[in-house]
From Swiss-Prot:
The keyword Signal does not apply. It comes from Artichoke mottled crinkle virus (AMCV). This is Movement protein. Pfam families: TBSV_P22. The lineage of its organism: Viruses, Riboviria, Orthornavirae, Kitrinoviricota, Tolucaviricetes. GO terms for cellular component: host cell membrane; membrane; viral capsid. One of its GO terms (biological process) is transport of virus in host, cell to cell. The keyword RNA-binding applies. Transports viral genome to neighboring plant cells directly through plasmosdesmata, without any budding. The movement protein allows efficient cell to cell propagation, by bypassing the host cell wall barrier. InterPro entries: TBSV_p22. Keywords: Host membrane, Membrane, RNA-binding, Transport, Viral movement protein. It comes from the Viruses. Belongs to the tombusvirus/aureusvirus movement protein p22 family. It is found in: Host membrane.
Amino acid sequence: MDTEYEQVNKPWSELYKETTLGNKLMVNVGMEDQEVPLLGSNFLTKVRVGLSGGYITMRRIRIKIIPLVSRKAGVSGKLYLRDISDTTGRKLHCTESLDLGREIRLTMQHLDFSVSTRSDVPIVFGFEELVSPFLEGRELFSIYVRWQFGLSKNCYSLPQSKWKVMYQEDALKVLKPSKKKASRTDSSV
């Protein structure tokens, strides 16, 4: 599968204007291509896809994700595409580690995966293996970092799940709690 991605440095004001465009997924149905918008999981959107063939194949997937956190937060993660039609959550694709403080543009020309038009098969895009230089317990995200593309006649929703956050050891070593304790002692005296 050919994958291209880039991270773009743009002022927040420009990126804010693009948020209404959202992320888009191009699906191939029979002989026709159709764009499907992907919105955050806290939004509900319905897209009518003309089912002219027996299978839907995923190709020319283009995803644009605006910054999820402040650039200064230094949070990075890998974007996974998973088929969650069963409990295994089969991995369809995984990118290298990306900076979540910058705009991410991901393009995949071919995805070796097809879906029967008669089945309920959700495909999930989500950031996993998150890394942060901050201590545990700090609130990293203000929005949910997962999107869903599902084929279903009924309303389909995923159960909430917490993403595991891993921390960079090198960044934590830089923090010296002994100096902080000493300064607190000095100020109290």
